[in-house]
Amino acid sequence: MQIVTKQGHPDFLDLPWDVPLAEWDHPRLVKMAHGISRHIVRFVRFDDRVYALKATELRAARSEYAVLRDLRDDHLPVVEPVGVVSDAPEPGNAVLITRYLDFSLPYWYLLGRNDPVLADRLMDAGVVLLVRLHLEGVFWGDCSLSNVLWRRDAGAMMAYLVDAETTERHATISDRMRDYDIDIAVENVVGGLFELQASGRIEYEIDVVGIAESLRLRYEALWSELTRVDEFDLDERWRIEQRVRRINDLGFDVEELSINRDGRTLTIKPVLIEEGHHARELRQRTGLEVQENQARRLLADIDQFRAWLERHDGQPIPRAVATARWLAEVYGPITGAVPKDMRSHLEPAEMFHQVLEHRYLMAERRRGEVTNDEALADYLDGVLKEQPKERRLRLDGPVPADTVGLDE
């Protein structure tokens, strides 16, 4: 047996590697919610961190570990690969170790919340993930609801790849490969939704085929917006900035832009695109690591706070000063006021977003101003304490019948 792990993580030596993973009975085991898997998957806890262990073949484990490291190094939304345990318990067998993604939620939990809008949000997030992978030359090969985890993102969702067993990385991928990947995704989504309906976890009417087919339309619309070629007159160079801003509004940065001139005609095409425009800007300004829509919301609140400061002080306020004061006077006090026993319910940035939404709703009902302190107190007492603890979603009650590897 050999254990290879990244620095900064446990050595995992106290686990019973001489026993098949399915037969483990160990105090480090914890029951965590996750998607349906063809493999045995168990979860172990070391201090404040949880790790997923997946039993597979040695070649598959090494390949998936390498792919996940490659994708993560390129800042794509995937789970963190931690290590591979070789020849455990028998030669040729292996266990892939990944870090559990805090505040991540499986599809069956989200769709079982009886909120029909969530299905659309999950599809939108899945499309963004698939487009990001294809832009980076990644053929997934098994896009499904079970192979994705979602995190809340300021009213939207963000999707993370959690299974790269069939994934291939190329310099670029052809339209044919993209189409095939979409076909697989549509088929798998249909199957996943029908399974949920059959299990009774979805109690509302849902157009399974319509939702799955909309995935293709959403994908094609986003792919076209990000990659299409535009032609316009030489005097309309302002349209270059317009195109870039439209891509930024979708949450993507244009790192390189191909511009060709033929007489009085300009042809432009984005050639290097990276998702996370607002998240990068917020990180540069504040040091906060949040998701894209959360960053968009926080940046808007910083701008509003800066405008309020300028009206209050009667003079211009530098952006850096406004940002520092926002962190100290707005974001810090609100997120820091959450009692310790509630901090595992939502990520700080998501909770902050919900407080802003709650303040708006309170002001509408009151038809007058509501302070942050008032909104926060009402939110903590009436909303947050009723939220499930989503940092590490434990298994309570029924789960999908065909889920493999859960610690019952």
What are the functions of these language-model segments?
Residues 1-17:
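A short, basic N-terminal segment
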Residues 95-99, 157-163:
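A short beta-strand motif that forms the metal-chelation/ATP-contact edge
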